[in-house]
Amino acid sequence: MIGNAKLKPETGEVWTIGYDTKLNDKIQLGINAFYSELDDAINWAALDPNNFLSDWTVANVAKQKKRGMEFNVKYKLTDEFSINGSYTYVKVEEDNKDGNGFKRNTNVSPNQYKIGISFNKDKWDAELYGRGASGADKSKYVDSKYLTLDLSLQYKVQKDYKIYAKAYNLTNASYAETGGVSNGKYSFPMPGRSFLIGMEYAF
């Protein structure tokens, strides 16, 4: 990664609108929409656009438009268990002043999903959830979609002290969240199955 001393600050406008409601004691719904227009938007760029393995730097995109929406729902099964899910759609377009106008940024998967089940009782918290995406451009991704599972477990020892264990990508899926393919493999792959154990103290 190489720095860029000529980097300019982003300027622009962002609009958001949303609505959250609780239908009853068990169901919560939410929907949000957003739109932004930025000048000198900051993004990563390969020094050699034809070689994703070349050095990268942060650079200003002339103009960027981003629009999208998110829908989420939570359903309380019992006092201890609940399920939740969300869907996010995002579209990013950029104009690099190359005479071609705005073009879609295909490094971003347009459809993103999350669904999980949570357990909360006394000092215990646990969550198992799946994360996925679809609609990715196969010129930038090995596969247009992916799905992976994560697990977290937490125990509150005291008011300000807790211990936790987390497992990521339980399915050991091969996937990426940022576009880039070289010789049929992801240039920026996400980690395979991994585990984390830790503690947290608040003061």
Task: Annotate each language-model stretch with its function.
Residues 34-37, 57-139, 156, 171:
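Gram-negative outer-membrane beta-barrel transporters
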Residues 1, 41-50, 90, 94-102, ...:
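Outer-membrane beta-barrel translocator domains and adjoining extracellular loop/strand segments
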